[in-house]
Amino acid sequence: IGGCLKKGLSRGRWTLFGDFSMQAIYAEGVSGTKLIEKLDDITSFIRFKLTVNCRNTKPICKEIETVTGFKAPHDLWTKVDGPPVQYLTWSTMESQCKKLKAVLKQLADSHIEPGKITILSPRKREDSVVSMLDGYVVKDFSVSPGMNTTFCTIQAYKGLENSVIILADIEGFSAEKLMYVGLSRACTGLYVLESDSAKREYDNLLMRRLFNE
């Protein structure tokens, strides 16, 4: 960043927004505090804490809590209600493809614009169920807004959002930060295509949350 900024980070003018805890997916073993301290070593700056989640609906926030264990004070979560998060379980890539097509058809029947739908996966496109889709136009995500449904890896979509997110190729929930990023990209509708083993893992996570309430 410093190389792109006139006078660099130390002397230039900049504003940085960041989630240095749950979305620091490339900083394994380094805490959010340590990341900010690294910036402190370069320059001085004013800190301002954002305290309200303006993106996700209450059901999505609840699923984030269930899957990742991340529990923010409830007054910081959004007050906006929305549809429940939908989980669809698959046993083979073929069955996952059928379920993905069913979701896309359901959204089309509900008159959801294709451009408001993004499919996210922990896998690259060639290894994802998206590569098996036929009869649907799914473009690779680009910054320029388009009219088509888009695909992107969860990692590359960090910091972005869309009205409807479909998480595909989910075979487990142990990568908590990655799952946090994926789940929290959705503004309104969230669908999760999970494997049989991921379903069992999710059931255990749900029990953990219920016992802790």
Describe the predicted segments one by one.
Residues 1-213:
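Conserved helicase motor core of SF1/SF2 NTP-dependent helicases
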